[in-house]
């Protein structure tokens, strides 16, 4: 989940996961089972999301200069609220220190380094940010456990690995084909 630093809900977004994780710690201390398969854990929100705040150079300059920052309506761009830019960045840092979210994406840099800018701007990424591209484009990642290709004698089973790679590529092509 990526939210622009000028979004009117940014303050709530910054703290949403940290607040839920504090709730989880309190419940655990009260004796509730907070293991991942527990029904008690199911009451903790936002745990299956990777949150990031999208910041611009203009925001970072406002932080450096100690300026205020406008939170703007998504519908018409009107200013909904004005906040202290440094305080907002401090909140991002504090929430991230508490629960590892939100991360930060640097919008200006991402779009400056865009490999195909004529296709449109990049507004977000997949959850771990290893794939950056335009809206409505696919990120279909897959992986193979290389230890599964280790033979009993310690050698790497190259033919089996090559076969697995072929199957994975075919599966990815099918996923892309059916997603259209």
Predicted feature locations:
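Hydrophobic core segments within long, regular secondary-structure runs in both alpha-
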Residues: 162-172
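Active-site cavity-forming subdomains of large catalytic enzyme subunits
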Residues: 1-161, 174-180
